[in-house]
Regions:
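Glycine-/small-residue-rich active-site loops that bind phosphorylated ligands and cofactors
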Residues: 23-24, 59-60, 88, 171, ...
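Left-handed beta-helix
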Residues: 129, 136-353
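Conserved N-terminal catalytic core of the sugar/cofactor nucleotidyltransferase
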Residues: 1-59, 64-66, 70, 98, ...
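Conserved beta-strand termini and adjacent loop/short-helix elements that scaffold enzyme active sites
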Residues: 17-19, 81, 164-166
């Protein structure tokens, strides 16, 4: 694991610790802090002085060594990475109130009336004995979470807590809308989060596949396309994964299409997220009409997006509205008069039967 990033080392590397239920009284991870609690024995085996806690759904570039130096210089028990946000957006975040020396005086989890615009990034450095003591004290806390439980516990117990201020690009992509936004920002003329900076390049696994092919009559504008793609249509302001096939007459705008997906001929796709290994038939329209609240979960399936899950099939000739969700192999009879109206869903398993 981690070969493309030089993480398959004898010392260090990456270990995946997935949640699973063992015999006895163990359980699936019920919160961010509970996940660490259930792996305390693994962490203890390394006898660390410090533990760095990160979220897996954030995008940023940070030199953690600088943050660790800040933690050591202040003899901190807990250091929280923070960044300033517009005050009108501050209620979406855990908010830190710190003095001129960056010592934290208060912490508010998503306050209605925030007293500061310094937002927690969900990145923490703990001195391991302090974190271990907090996790043991909170082991019976339901859905134990760092922002809601561990940080307040440390503050209430007078731990030395400091705010490390970060001013680079950072984006939480924990929702479909923010995930779509982050991808669209990558195709800006000068992206704020630049994958190609000489001094800090972003590497990934390089599969040995054929190069991108754009056919005569095909057109690609302000987009990122992976290797192995074949484009016979028009792609604009989109992010396309590897081995995607785009048929003649297809028009794709403001969309994310993941690897190994096939798009038919004369298809129109607007503002959609299509997962891996899907098949979209000929003469299909995705993203038409007005936005309507999603009937399954309007907070998740929103932002005017069409969301199609992995291994799904969309039959020829159908029209699909905004704020919709589709998963599974679907057939013409699943679409009333050939249409899935805005806000509706089709969720199937396996072959759709």
């Amino acid at each position: 694991i981690g070969i493309p990033w030089d993480l398959d080392r004898n010392n260090g590397g990456v270990a995946i610790l997935p949640p699973y239920e063992k015999s006895g009284n163990s359980e699936w991870y019920t919160g961010t802090a509970n996940a660490i609690y259930q792996n305390m024995r693994y962490i203890d085996s390394y006898n660390p002085d410090y533990v760095l806690i990160l979220s897996g759904d954030h995008i940023y570039k940070m030199d953690y060594e600088v943050m660790l130096d800040f933690h050591k210089e202040n003899n901190a028990d807990v250091t929280i990475a923070t960044m300033p946000v517009p005050i009108e957006e501050a209620s979406r975040f855990g908010i830190v109130i710190a003095d001129d020396d960056k010592r934290i005086n208060a912490f508010e989890e998503k306050p209605v009336h925030p007293r500061s615009n310094l937002a927690s990034m969900g990145i923490y450095i703990f001195s391991w004995p302090v974190l271990k003591e907090a996790l043991l004290a909170l082991k019976d806390q339901e859905n134990c979470d760092f922002g809601k439980h561990v940080i307040p516990y440390c503050f209430e117990n007078d731990r030395r807590m400091f705010a490390y201020e970060f001013n680079g690009y950072w984006k939480d992509v924990g929702t479909l809308g923010s995930y779509w936004e982050a991808n669209m920002e990558l195709v800006d003329l000068i992206p704020e989060f630049n994958l190609y900076e000489e001094y800090w390049k972003i590497y990934t696994k390089n599969d040995a596949i054929e190069p991108l092919y754009i056919a005569k009559g095909g057109h690609v504008e302000r987009s990122i396309m992976g290797e192995g793609c074949e484009c016979y249509g028009h792609v604009e302001h989109s992010v396309i994964g590897a081995n995607v096939k785009i048929g003649r007459g297809a028009v794709i705008r403001d969309s994310i299409i993941m690897c190994d997906t096939e798009i038919g001929s004369n298809v129109t796709i607007d503002k959609s997220i299509i997962a891996e290994n899907c098949k979209v038939g000929d003469n299909v329209t995705l993203g038409f009409g007005q936005e309507k609240p999603n009937v399954l979960n309007e907070s998740i399936y929103s932002f005017g997006l069409v969301t199609i899950g992995e291994d799904s099939v969309i039959p020829d000739g159908v029209k699909i509205g905004k704020n919709t969700a589709i998963s599974g192999v679907t057939y013409e009879e699943d679409y009333k008069d050939g249409v899935l109206e805005g806000g509706e869903v089709i969720i199937k398993a396996g072959d759709g039967k």
